[in-house]
């Protein structure tokens, strides 16, 4: 068995906390219609998994569940959450998803922020609709890395002053730069919901920061459902 926790970037990670089911689960969840069951994952079972995925018979994939803990910048978390909300317009993807996030109303651990390295800043894409283009010149990146560092340092100073003056955490947090701030959350989804997330966030036009996390989710999910996930991602 591989690692259950994968580092992402300088500070982030994805941790597989728990799961329910195996590759054999969607097979037997589909076979219940005929009051049959398989005890081993052979070629027939693998063909059935592929058939179910290819023909969008997705309900058998909703009984298997994965539970992740994620530590990522808020801008990644909000994209992730938007995907979960949007899935309600699909074939019930949201019915087996859950989300619980840490709150700075209650915790005062030292804030962590995403600060891109000078060579990690990206340009506006040619079509200008969304996403990003090629990296900007390093000297331009250096300017904005330094500017962001100064901005965060001043924000942290104001946050700490407010806390020292007995301002409540739920208001003191207003001084923290939101989108760069790392947050921690637990995300639980059915195997189908996880595959739906991966199909969107592994795409080349997905934002790099969330794509990095999606690659970690994929590695962890493949550890537990190699055949079923492959079928869903290639359907």
Where are these regions (language model features)?
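Family-specific signature for flavin-dependent thymidylate synthase
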Residues: 1-235
């Amino acid at each position: 068995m591989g690692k259950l926790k994968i580092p992402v970037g300088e500070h982030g990670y994805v941790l597989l906390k728990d799961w329910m089911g195996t590759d054999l689960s969607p097979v037997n969840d589909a076979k219940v219609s005929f009051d049959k069951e398989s005890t081993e994952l052979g070629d027939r079972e693998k063909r059935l998994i592929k058939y179910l995925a290819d023909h969008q018979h997705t309900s058998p994939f909703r009984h298997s569940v994965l539970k992740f803990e994620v530590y990522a910048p808020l801008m990644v978390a909000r994209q992730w959450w938007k995907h979960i909300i949007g899935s309600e317009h699909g074939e019930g993807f949201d019915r087996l998803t859950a989300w619980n996030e840490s709150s700075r109303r209650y915790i005062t651990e030292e804030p962590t922020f995403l600060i891109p390295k000078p060579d990690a800043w990206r340009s506006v894409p040619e079509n200008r609709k969304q996403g990003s283009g090629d990296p900007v010149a390093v000297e331009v990146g250096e300017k904005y890395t330094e500017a962001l560092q100064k901005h965060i340092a001043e924000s942290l100073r104001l946050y700490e002053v407010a806390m020292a003056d007995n301002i409540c955490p739920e208001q003191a947090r207003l001084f923290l730069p939101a989108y760069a701030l790392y947050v921690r959350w637990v995300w639980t989804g059915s195997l189908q919901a996880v595959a739906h997330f991966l199909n969107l966030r592994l795409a080349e036009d997905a934002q790099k920061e969330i794509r990095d996390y999606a690659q970690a989710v994929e590695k962890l999910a493949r550890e537990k459902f190699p055949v079923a996930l492959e079928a869903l991602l290639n359907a």
